[in-house]
Curated annotation (Swiss-Prot):
Pfam families: 40S_S4_C, KOW, Ribosomal_S4e, RS4NT, S4
Protein name (database record): Small ribosomal subunit protein eS4
Major location (coarse): cytoplasm
Localization terms from the record: Cytoplasm
Keyword match rRNA-binding: yes
Domain of life the protein comes from: Eukaryota
GO cellular component: cytosolic small ribosomal subunit; nucleus; ribosomal subunit
First and last residue of the signal peptide: none
Gene name tied to this protein: RPS4
Protein keywords: Cytoplasm, Ribonucleoprotein, Ribosomal protein, RNA-binding, rRNA-binding
PROSITE patterns: RIBOSOMAL_S4E, S4
Domain S4 RNA-binding: 42-104
HAMAP family for the chain: Ribosomal_eS4 (MF_00485)
Amino acid sequence: MARGLKKHLKRLNAPRHWMLDKLGGAFAPKPSSGPHKSRECLPLILILRNRLKYALTYREVIAILMQRHVMVDGKVRTDKTYPAGFMDVVSIPKTNEDFRLLYDTKGRFCLHAITGDETKFKLCKVRSVQFGQKGIPYLNTYDGRTIRYPDPLIKANDTIKLDLESNKIVDFIKFDVGNVVMVTGGRNRGRVGVIKNREKHKGSFETIHVQDAAGHEFATRLGNVFTIGKGTKPWVSLPKRKGIKLSIIEEARKRLAAQNAA
């Protein structure tokens, strides 16, 4: 008789955006319980071993973590399968490196290097705003945080700017038409654009129409949209392509141009 959760994860069942090779063994690291869903996170072992190449083996990753060299959102993490997720700040003080976990235009996690003031905050999407015991208002964020006494103007689907040292809300962005967003789910994951229109369907999910900087329009669900700035200016720096997805033909032309130039 099965008792509790599975403790293993087969490599073929691992999320595609982890980019694990098929011949690297039968198993993949199973993410621990944490602030992000198991299929929407990147375990620390994959960050250190597969992405940053600071370790060659599983044991080397454990040795690095046990020396307390890795911090996620300003807290030391020693769990090798700790689930880091979208917008998390991964810091390695020994090498003076800081990264923010974002999506590239192909929907895969990328470690985007950040510096200065950007390492001191993260953006959090508000899941719900409720009242607790004795009428105390609080909000829940997408990464499992509960923050009491928020600004009364903050509603569900808005984005808050959270100071990682004090864990206090510094500022917030309303989920409005005209603000810049990043898509965090579905086939358009990783694309960045400005909200053009909101379609409300009674008894069904809301559809959001987004236009990117290249003028391409696409639609996605409300739950897949994460506001990252006011107007067209994002509050966080973006990866190389700035969230603009190229079509297959545009990518082929770009490759040909690069080959001809070489």
